[in-house]
């Protein structure tokens, strides 16, 4: 451990390209062996304030990797990540990745989402850059999975963002509402109209999560009328169609649907969300799944028109 810390000290004195290159190597190691980073998170966190923004971004991505695979290792740097998220002068991609890391930490360790962090996540949905909003919504869904109680009084405010142009924002927020509704279904009353409007959402996974949330409300003591049309026949992907069908069936009163496909189950949500996000962000054919722009075969890993990462 002491030798590794000494190496990190020497790395801080190296040039920016060397720092960035070595941190990428460290991130690759973290993907394979995250447990070896125990007690190294704090020394690594000093690179979050590096003078070079590419170094800061690489470090933030490193902590996303650690927070997702071995959250206990990254837990000591919650404050450092929160400071980057709260810094309006910080490069927005750095803040986006810090929000993502904080979300993974909150899912595993709910106390990591302090009231101040939660406020930054919620407020940023209204004012931040589009790329950051996606990660803020993702982090909020993880907060809800870790402790749904934290968002039960914020449903109305968050529901206002279900009209976002970004389908990932809509997906993550409807997912957060399902997580809240699994424990506090009555809390969803504050967002019922916005959830009903998602019956016409262009994305079948968003429609499915909205149906799931409304189903939780309908299966409680709350009397709620549900949309009858959810566009089930218009879905081309078999996986997306199955996802939507089971949740619409649940919403319309089929309790058996929950047992069949893990509907209205937070563990299932946690296990399947990354796969669903990949399905949403993977372009069909040659176009961007968000704005439809034609994409070159060997172009950058993001849409040059709307900025959606792939």
Report residues per predicted region:
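Acidic, polar-rich N-terminal leader regions of halophilic archaeal proteins
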Residues: 1-310
């Amino acid at each position: 451990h002491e030798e590794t810390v000494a190496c990190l000290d020497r790395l801080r004195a190296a040039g920016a390209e060397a720092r960035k290159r070595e941190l990428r190597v460290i991130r690759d190691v973290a993907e394979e062996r995250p447990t070896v980073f125990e007690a190294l998170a704090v020394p690594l966190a000093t690179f979050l304030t590096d003078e070079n923004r590419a170094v800061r971004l690489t470090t933030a991505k490193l902590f996303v990797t650690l927070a997702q695979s071995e959250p206990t290792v990254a837990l000591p740097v919650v404050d450092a990540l929160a400071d980057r998220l709260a810094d309006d002068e910080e490069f927005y991609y750095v803040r986006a990745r810090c929000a993502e890391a904080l979300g993974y930490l909150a899912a595993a360790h709910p106390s990591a989402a302090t009231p101040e962090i939660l406020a930054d996540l919620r407020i940023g949905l209204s004012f931040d850059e589009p790329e950051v909003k996606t990660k803020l919504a993702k982090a909020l869904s993880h907060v809800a999975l870790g402790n749904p109680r934290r968002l039960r009084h914020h449903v109305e405010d968050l529901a206002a963002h279900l009209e976002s142009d970004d389908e990932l924002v809509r997906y993550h927020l409807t997912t957060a509402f399902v997580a809240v509704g699994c424990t506090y279904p009555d809390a969803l009353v504050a967002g019922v109209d916005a959830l009903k409007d998602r019956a016409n959402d262009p994305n079948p996974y968003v429609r499915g999560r909205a149906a799931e949330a409304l189903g939780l409300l309908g299966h409680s003591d709350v009397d709620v009328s549900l949309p009858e049309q959810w566009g089930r026949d218009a879905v081309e992907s078999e996986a997306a169609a199955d996802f939507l069908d089971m949740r619409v069936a649940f919403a319309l009163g089929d309790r058996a649907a929950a047992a069949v496909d893990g509907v209205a189950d937070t563990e299932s949500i946690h296990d399947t969300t990354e796969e669903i996000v990949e399905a949403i962000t993977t372009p069909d054919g040659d176009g961007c799944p968000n704005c439809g722009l034609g994409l070159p075969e060997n172009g950058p890993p993001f849409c040059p028109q709307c900025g959606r990462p792939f």
